Regions:
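Cytochrome P450
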Residues: 1-401
């Protein structure tokens, strides 16, 4: 097999990973890295892996990993597994219960509130002519939406935000012990606060998602206290992190494709446009699985063996730029007919539960920004997050008028 390297820590890869994906897909689509994990870059291989129950999401339980300080810390300090890392049937039960709060009709009811939050977030930019996209729009809107959904008190919003950001950093597979320790401290502060909120809500049920999660029942089963707590923490983290990066990536895509920006100005932002923005530069680039059995993937006339318990990095970003599925994949094209085949929200049983919410928030935030300002220019080049899994800008200064 031809020599090709995958170094996700290279600053150039952080800025633009897609040329590396192209080379891997062409020369070594089932790539074994020096670190011992396998990288998949073909669309069909990624989809098949995510939909195959012989591949587990529970890495700590099923992967053959060397004992490291990081792994030891995770094992000794995790009180319960997030739904993100559970396999069926445990995942199936939890998902069935919590999905009742994420129906399309329930999400669509949020449109007026999201619009209000976006309008409020852009008010200052109308006066100053400048907008720091992440701090002033991409972060506060989805974070407040999640707080509203759970009917959280607003008195400790800044603390919740700080805790959430610290905990989010621990989700990266490359996280070190120092960040994990910070995450445990943040969870230690967050849990008592959320426990008090949940106790209060049990006595004062309302028309909010937290009340719904407390009361939801199916076939005699309900969420226990630990499951409820784990899911509320997950909501706070995943509920805003994806959208923050999606909004930032979307504006970067539009400002580097002025022809498509002009199309959006003319028609408004549509759900299909959001799908194309997700395909073009999605906020989640990779997801990890481990096979429960020895398996193989066919490349040309050869079966590439993947051993039970090995780590498999299914590259969502690479799949979204596979030319065998998406013609001219490196072009942002709002006339593309199959944009909705993107893998930005993964596939299979772990398809993102909050996908419809993230899409609605992005549709309104990006669409309103483009409609509100006739001129949007880059004041300084974006700073990209130093993450393996998450792709997004940490800072993006714009001039608007």
């Amino acid at each position: 097999m031809a020599e090709v390297s995958f170094n996700p820590f290279d600053p150039e890869f952080r800025k633009n990973p897609y040329p590396v994906y192209d080379k891997l897909r062409e020369l070594d689509p089932v790539h074994l890295t020096p670190l011992g994990f396998v990288v998949l870059t073909r669309y069909d291989d990624v989809v098949n892996t995510l939909r195959n129950n012989d591949f587990s999401r529970d890495i700590e339980l099923n992967a053959n990993l060397p004992e490291t300080p990081t792994r030891k810390f995770r094992r000794e300090n995790e009180r319960s597994k997030s739904m993100l890392n559970l396999d069926p049937p445990d995942h199936t039960r939890l998902r069935r219960l919590v999905s009742k709060s994420f129906t399309p009709s329930a999400i669509e009811k949020l449109r007026p509130r999201i619009q209000q939050l976006v309008d409020d977030s852009l008010a200052n930019a109308k006066k100053t002519g400048s907008l720091e996209l992440v701090e002033e729009l991409a972060f506060p809107v989805p974070f407040q939406v999640i707080s509203d959904l759970l009917a959280m008190p607003t008195d400790r919003g800044e603390e919740l935000r700080e805790w959430s950001q610290i905990i989010t950093a621990t989700l990266e597979p490359t996280t070190g012990v120092e960040d994990l320790e910070k995450g445990q401290i943040a969870i230690g502060k967050m849990r008592p606060y959320l426990e008090e909120v949940i106790r209060h809500r049990r006595k004062n049920m309302g028309d909010d998602m937290l009340s719904s999660l407390i009361s939801v029942e199916e076939q005699g089963e309900k969420l226990n206290n630990e499951e409820l707590m784990s899911f509320v923490i997950l909501l706070y983290i995943a509920g805003h992190e994806t959208t923050v990066n999606l909004i930032g990536n979307s504006m970067h895509a539009l400002l580097t494709h002025p022809d498509q920006l002009a199309v959006m100005r003319e028609t408004g932002c549509t759900p299909n446009m959001v799908d194309e923005l997700l395909r073009f530069n999605g906020p989640v680039q990779h997801t990890i699985r481990t096979p429960l059995i020895d398996t193989s993937i066919r490349v040309d006339n050869q079966d590439i063996k993947i051993s039970k318990g090995s780590l498999v990095l299914a590259s969502l970003g690479a799949g979204n730029h596979d030319p065998s599925v998406f013609t001219n994949p490196h072009e942002l094209d709002f006339s593309r007919r199959n944009s909705n085949k993107h893998l930005a929200f993964a596939a299979g049983v772990h398809y993102c539960l909050g996908a419809s919410l993230a899409k609605l928030e992005t549709e309104i935030a990006v669409g309103t920004l483009v409609k509100t300002f006739a001129n949007i220019e880059v004041a300084s080049e974006p700073e990209w997050r130093d993450r393996l899994t998450i792709r997004g800008v940490s800072r993006y200064e714009l001039n608007v008028s």
